[in-house]
Amino acid sequence: MVLALAGCSTGDTGDATPGAAAEPADEASGPAATPSVEASAGGGGGDYDIAFVQGVAGDEFYITMQCGIEEAAAELGVTVSTQGAQEFDPTLQTPIVDSVVAAAPDALLIAPTDVTAMRRPIQAAIDAGIEVVLVDTTLEDPSGVVSQIASDNIGGGAAAFDAIESANPDGGKVLVIGVEPGISTTDARAEGFEAAVAENPAFTSLGVQYSQNQPARAAEIVTGALQADPDIVGIFAANLFAAEGAATGIRQAGVEGITVVGFDAGPAQVEALQAGTVQALVAQEPANIGRQGVEQAIAQLNGEETEPEIQTGFTIITAENVDTPEGQEAAYRAEC
């Protein structure tokens, strides 16, 4: 069964989080640039240049978003350049944004890596006359941006609990593997999950533990939690790397019968689902987020009406639908 949570055009994107966030930064890590896409003729784009700054380079969520951006750019006749730091960290993302501001594109699509730390560099872009669209993650103060486009992350967290609840009708203990505090999207997913747990007295939440976006750390958390509390019936991994690590932790613990629901649907997560280590994946719509980001930027540049907040939906991928056209379409891409 494919369960799609419908997106709505005026949702609260303040609840968004990274498609996948990355581990704390090494100052030596630099940006990974992707060649510009010289878009073919299209309608409504003019000769605009759009910069896309990913949350982190090499992450299938942001790669899939980049694909959507490039597809929209080709259709609308604009040029797109993509950059991203090697780790999900504002100290690495800030100099990339500073360099983008110096290059003076017409618009900037960006997934902020921190709700407060990225406000200053993004404000600098706004002050320079660059139209800014926030994609995936957001800011504590998003004033001055054209639009915020993100998944309904609170709803996605609740949907993750629904999957665990359905597999464990008698209830039990559940655990959340988050990324780190202060990331808008993953915080919202945990919030939605915890709120849903609280509505069913048969379940007890063991709270949120943070993996710092490191699969190895997520594996350690899961292995340790299962050793300390064998009554755990379900684990919610709040992003791609947490899900990858949770699957590893389950294997290392040698425990069966645990329902693991992962957020995001990269190749490793799909393989874990097919192997039976993970029972469900909450797949976002990163390509759709990217396409809508381009559309909102161009609308603003053309003096047309824009939407300040847009929420996109989800598809729940399970063993039953992973090999169907719907399941394959929902899985993330490793390249465009």
Tell what function each PLM region has.
Residues 8-336:
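A residue-level marker of the well-folded mature domains of exported/periplasmic proteins
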Residues 3-7:
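C-terminal motif of bacterial Sec signal peptides marking the signal peptidase cleavage site
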